[in-house]
């Protein structure tokens, strides 16, 4: 099942990038989707992943996950952005590398969560997929700005999407004793993306609808957490 989750996450990258090529980013106010994704990622981090982690032992790993993705974003310049903003990022290949590294780590995190608790794996996967929608759009826009052809962009998105199953496969080599540390690292990743990347992007201009989107994202995970175990 975890490999199915990983494939779905990869497909979300490809579909989001394809929609950007079709002009979706110019027609839809992505702030609401970004805000919803931020709410989901923060809810999963604080309410699902962190309760599985011993913070007394793994606080440093949590901080390392946060710092690692801060450095990755600043070096690779990968972040949710609008079409006009991405026109200044002439770094197509670097964008693909950054997204691929992020995908690999997310794939491993999804698998580790699944190994600890299949429902936790589902929640992490949900957060990853929703995050990949703005990320896939961003990567596509960056590559368009770098004058890549649509075919080349789709191939790049497809290859980077394969890093999810590859990351999931590597989770099988992580000893059980390190599963909590892996989750702490993923929590740091999610908290950084949700709080330092997605939320600021969603709130470029004050808008109560964006705030509602964030709250809705967190509420959605609460509803999912309540109903899915009953099925």
Regions picked out by a protein language model, each given a short descriptive name:
Residues 1-231:
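Intrinsically disordered, metal-sensing/regulatory segments
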């Amino acid at each position: 099942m975890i490999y199915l989750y990983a494939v779905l996450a990869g497909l979300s990258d490809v579909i989001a990038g394809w929609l950007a090529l079709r002009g979706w980013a110019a027609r839809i106010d992505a702030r609401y989707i970004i805000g919803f994704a931020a709410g989901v990622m923060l809810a999963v981090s604080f309410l699902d992943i962190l309760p599985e982690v011993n913070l007394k032992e793994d606080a440093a790993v949590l901080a390392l996950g946060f710092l690692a993705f801060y450095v990755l974003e600043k070096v690779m310049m990968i972040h949710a952005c609008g079409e006009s903003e991405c026109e200044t990022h002439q770094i197509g290949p670097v964008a693909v590398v950054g997204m691929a590294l992020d995908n690999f780590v997310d794939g491993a995190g999804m698998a580790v969560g699944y190994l600890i608790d299949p429902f936790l794996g589902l929640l992490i996967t949900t957060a990853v997929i929703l995050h990949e929608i703005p990320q896939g759009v961003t990567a596509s826009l960056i590559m368009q700005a770098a004058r890549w052809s649509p075919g080349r962009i789709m191939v790049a998105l497809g290859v980077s999407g394969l890093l999810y199953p590859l990351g999931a496969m590597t989770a099988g080599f992580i000893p059980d004793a390190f599963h909590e540390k892996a989750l702490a690292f993923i929590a740091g990743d999610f908290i950084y993306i949700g709080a330092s990347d997605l939320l600021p992007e969603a709130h470029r201009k004050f808008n109560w609808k964006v705030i509602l989107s964030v709250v809705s994202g967190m509420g959605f995970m609460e509803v999912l957490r309540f109903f899915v175990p009953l099925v």
